[in-house]
Structures are given as C-alpha cells and as structure tokens.
Amino acid sequence: MLKLKTAVVAFGAAIVLAAAGYGPAVQAGDWPTEKQCKKVAKDGDTIIKGWCAAITRKAGNCLACHQAMVNPWPEGFPVGGNIGPPLVAMAARFPNRDDLRAQVWDATATNPNTSMPPFGRHKLISEEDIDNIVDWLLSI
C-alpha cells in the first residue's frame, strides 16, 4: 500500500510540475534532430549526447516506445511511441540515479515481463550511451 501511495504522489508531483511550466534543462531550440546529432554528439555535453543516443534509431531509439517532454519538439521530428511510459519528471520518479541507470541497463531485473530490452546486459548500446541517456532523462 505504501508503494502505491508513493507512486500516486510521484505521479501527482509530475503533473503539477509539468502544468507549472517546468521544462527540460536544455532551453527551447537546443534539441538537435537525429541528423544534427551526428555533428553535435561528439562535442556536446552529456545531456545532449543522451538525447542523441535516445533518438538515434541505431542506438537507444527510446522514442520508438516512449514519449518525452521536451520543448519545443524538433521540427519535423516524429512524436514518440506509446508502448512504454512517458519520459516525464524522471528525477521525481527516480530520485536515485543508480536506480534509473539500472532500469535502462536491464529493465527485466525489476519486471521480467517488460517489453523494454536490456540495453546494457545485451550490450545493445555502450555504457557511455547509457550514462548519457540517464543524464538526459534526469534533466527532463
């Protein structure tokens, strides 16, 4: 019962923060498209590198299953999927960075029936990409 209350409170906080106008750490216009990521990913900070790993179809491809709250959405960029939960208020949902990293590394550890691939365990993406994705997730 306590876990349910905690989940409800965290979800409520996420809705309130989203409604209050809290946005991602990166400001409007700063989110590169997949094509632009090829240029900025090498020199960008970890948050931009995480965004690029998350949207790149040959890397994390997180947005195939998840929607993300970024403002503004890159022009001409397809909206995210609806298979997984939306990527919103991630710092509230995962106050411990290691827990979020473990979820990205192998979501089957906490939910054997998840459709999320174990990116780290199966070496689908690099450890650096996982760290960068976690940094990006904690910024939104």
Feature annotation, model-predicted:
Residues 63-105, 118-121:
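Gly/Gly-Pro-rich "capping" loops immediately C-terminal to redox-active cysteine motifs
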Residues 98, 102-111, 120-140:
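C-terminal capping alpha-helices of c-type cytochrome domains
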Residues 57-61, 69, 129:
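Short pre-active-site segment immediately N-terminal to redox-active cysteine/selenocysteine motifs
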Residues 48-49, 85, 114-117:
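Positions in alpha-helical segments
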Residues 26-58:
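Electrostatic cytochrome c docking/interface patches
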Residues 44, 56, 94-95, 124-128:
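Soluble non-cytosolic domains of exported or imported proteins
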Residues 1-36:
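N-terminal export/targeting leaders of redox proteins
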